[in-house]
């Protein structure tokens, strides 16, 4: 699996003007350490932010750029930063980097942290300056051992060079940065569950309001941003808003570039930095190379396991939030998965729902009970032992676990692929209905 934007399918020469995230990558995929990073304008944006810009000007620059969160939700970053309190007496503030990348079929943040650790450090330094945060934590997926090692080395290098710690670059600004490895729970991708875990608590989502900007880690104002989001900040501050807005393709409502990828039985699975608005067909055919010989594209997901399935006819959709919404799902992380014609959708959904059921924190009843119920029904259908009404029950579960009906977005993301699979591949589910009726009574509705 290609973990960089380098590859035979990438015909674009990477430069600072067109590939702000990946232009510094080495051809051998080794980490870019401080000396090399600084030789490629590394920390120039941080110097500008700390010595030439007011803190509020940094926030306004990011807001004007149109940068949105790259973790899947797509909330405007500058708006989120603007929620931090203006009261100067609240001088203990935290910046958290959500690096708990556990979405199946997603590995974009891993590449950035392993190969460009100083880009994340610089992005967090600038962001902390804007937010008046004196301490930052990178909440890292525990399995990312190489990323942890490289980030800790980058932090040590930055400290030794006076780029972290006290009075950074003579600006009077202090910022300490730490790596915290998680314990392996998918729910920690939700920002308040992440905060609870960092505090040493059970990783349950918190009720909002209050939002983390008001009451976050250890009760203090806190901002949580994704790895890729923070890595965009240096280029925006360094090159300006007008430049950043020229990167996306015409028609895209999202600005800048995005790390996108394709996995599955494609000829060239990989990860590429591409402008928002590129068509999914271009990503699939020109970059991923289409399907391997002997396989046909049956369906695809645009951005992780928590997004809905689409058909080959939907490949002309533009890869940005609004473009994917037009064909019925979310862009998510932007790393697509191809489902080939050898895959049974019932088996695939059973596998996916087992994952989501296992990763539920169990805090709210619909998610705690509904997801295992869906797994039970899918297992029966997979064995050919489904009963009449099972598909209708699954559809009710999709409805009852949908947006706004559970404590957080875990359950809605879990049932989105299930709902789309029932819509597009219903015959495969119907094939799992047994011709012999069960003697056991079956509930008529989900709520019974």
Swiss-Prot record:
GO annotation terms (biological process): cellular respiration
Cofactors required: FMN; [4Fe-4S] cluster
Keywords: 4Fe-4S, Flavoprotein, FMN, Iron, Iron-sulfur, Metal-binding, NAD, Quinone, Translocase, Ubiquinone
Cofactor binding summary note: Binds 1 FMN. Binds 1 [4Fe-4S] cluster.
GO cellular component: respiratory chain complex I
Protein EC: 7.1.1.-
SMART domains with a match to the protein in the record: NADH_4Fe-4S (SM00928)
Transmembrane regions: none
Function: NDH-1 shuttles electrons from NADH, via FMN and iron-sulfur (Fe-S) centers, to quinones in the respiratory chain. The immediate electron acceptor for the enzyme in this species is believed to be ubiquinone. Couples the redox reaction to proton translocation (for every two electrons transferred, four hydrogen ions are translocated across the cytoplasmic membrane), and thus conserves the redox energy in a proton gradient.
Protein name from the UniProt record: NADH-quinone oxidoreductase subunit F
Species this protein is from: Pseudomonas aeruginosa (strain ATCC 15692 / DSM 22644 / CIP 104116 / JCM 14847 / LMG 12228 / 1C / PRS 101 / PAO1)
């Amino acid at each position: 699996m290609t973990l960089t934007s380098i590859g035979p399918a990438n015909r674009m020469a990477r430069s600072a003007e067109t590939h702000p995230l990946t232009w510094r990558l080495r051809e051998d995929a080794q980490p870019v350490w401080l000396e090399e990073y600084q030789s490629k304008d590394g920390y120039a944006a941080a110097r500008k932010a700390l010595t030439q810009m007011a803190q509020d000007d940094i926030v306004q620059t990011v807001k004007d750029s149109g940068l949105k969160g790259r973790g899947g939700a797509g909330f405007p970053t500058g708006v989120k930063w603007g929620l931090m309190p203006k009261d100067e007496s609240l001088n203990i503030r935290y910046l958290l980097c959500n690096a708990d990348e556990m979405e199946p079929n997603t590995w974009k943040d891993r590449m950035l942290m392993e190969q460009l650790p100083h880009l994340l450090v610089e992005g967090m330094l600038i962001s902390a300056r804007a937010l008046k945060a004196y301490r930052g934590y990178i909440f890292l997926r525990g399995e990312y051992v190489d990323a942890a090692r490289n980030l800790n080395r980058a932090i040590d290098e930055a400290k030794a060079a006076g780029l972290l710690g006290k009075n950074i670059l003579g600006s009077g600004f202090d910022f300490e940065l730490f790596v915290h490895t998680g314990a392996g729970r998918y729910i920690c991708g939700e920002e308040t569950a992440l905060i609870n875990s960092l505090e040493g608590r059970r990783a349950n989502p918190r009720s909002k309001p209050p939002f983390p900007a008001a009451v976050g880690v250890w009760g203090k104002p806190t901002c949580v941003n994704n790895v890729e989001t923070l890595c965009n900040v240096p280029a925006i501050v360094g090159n300006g808003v007008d430049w950043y807005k020229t990167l996306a393709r015409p028609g895209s409502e999202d600005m800048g570039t995005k790390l996108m990828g394709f996995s599955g039985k494609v000829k060239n699975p990989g990860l590429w930095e591409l402008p928002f608005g590129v068509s999914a067909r271009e990503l699939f055919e020109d970059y991923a190379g289409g399907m391997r010989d002997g396989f046909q594209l049956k369906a695809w997901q645009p951005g992780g396991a928590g997004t809905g399935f689409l058909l080959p006819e939907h490949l002309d959709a533009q890869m940005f939030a609004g473009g994917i919404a037009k064909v019925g799902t979310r862009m998510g992380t932007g790393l697509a998965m191809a489902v080939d014609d050898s895959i049974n959708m019932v088996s695939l959904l059973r596998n996916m729902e087992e994952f989501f059921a296992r990763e539920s924190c169990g805090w709210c009843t619909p998610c705690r009970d509904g997801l295992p119920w869906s797994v039970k029904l899918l297992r029966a259908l997979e064995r050919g032992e489904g009963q009449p009404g099972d598909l209708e029950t699954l559809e009710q579960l999709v409805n009852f676990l949908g947006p706004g009906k559970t404590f957080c977005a875990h359950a809605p993301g879990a049932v989105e692929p299930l709902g789309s699979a029932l819509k597009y591949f219903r015959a495969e589910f119907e094939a799992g209905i047994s011709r012999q009726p069960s003697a056991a009574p079956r509930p008529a509705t989900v709520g019974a």
